[in-house]
């Protein structure tokens, strides 16, 4: 079986779902392929909390996701419920709730076709390239055992391991290069001082965190 679309996204991780929704917003037909039966990546498979403390920086599709999570707990258990409080304004959730919310977001995008149980094995023989670009990939339907071909103008690798990129011959390395190789003096350092808006329920204390990590005071100007 061969199927065509403007965009094929490999991996229904949060990044893959966001990419699919963004492409659909621009009027592109999208096929979203997921290896497992449960789209949503880590949040839908056990990682029930986000570690974003600087919630004033959150926007876009992720902000919509947190608001839908919050609405679920408020409508299901009530505005004064412990469940709503424990959801930390939508930043903490049960994996099943995360999956339901993400699938609901996909259902709102008719140009996106989600296909689960589609396995891409990271091998050059499972794709076709033309002028250095992928034009076709082949995946296994894990339910039927059939091999399916997907053609698209653009392919997006949203797997956690970079399976599609590796199969296409994109250079990669294991580990991390030195900061001098690309002139990145800040690489590998985590700067904890945040002077923007704090999210409700966040445990982040910018001054104390700065003192602990740097044994100094943050700038106040």
Residue ranges and their predicted role:
Residues 24-45:
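Glycine-rich FAD pyrophosphate-binding loop
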Residues 6, 27-30, 153:
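Residues that mark the start of a beta-strand
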